[in-house]
């Protein structure tokens, strides 16, 4: 991978990912991009912290490291930390959030598969918080969020509120462990990406350690 500050002609936004806070700041994110040999593209963020070109070789995969400083770190704030994947051919991708004892991976939907209405499905018991986020792939995206449980930003359960985002912007919301966010609803005027997780989830509820 190399630093590269201009998109190649023909590159299309293929997918998007965000990192959610893990157990500590020692967590590291990894983006794995799969495609045909010779596929080229770039991985970018609006804030400029991530800007790398890639070429997929005979292995069929390219890898980009994403430091935890690029993860969404402030609940309720609009942030420019999303990782956008552009490529000149179709690709698939996964995002790994790696930390000892608490690693998870998300398969990333193609931008064409993203929708305008979602329900959150998440596990309510964790070491710290239960989290969900939304990321826009178009300017002027307005999402109406109806949380299933009370959020730590002060938003009460069942009362809708709007989030306004431009392309590459994200907002994350959190709840205390034990608060059920499953069923939280998103109704959006444009397609966006939604992610949900527990910060060091406890399964079963009372771990044996």
Can you name each region flagged by the protein language model?
Residues 1-209:
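Conserved functional hotspot residues at active sites or interaction interfaces
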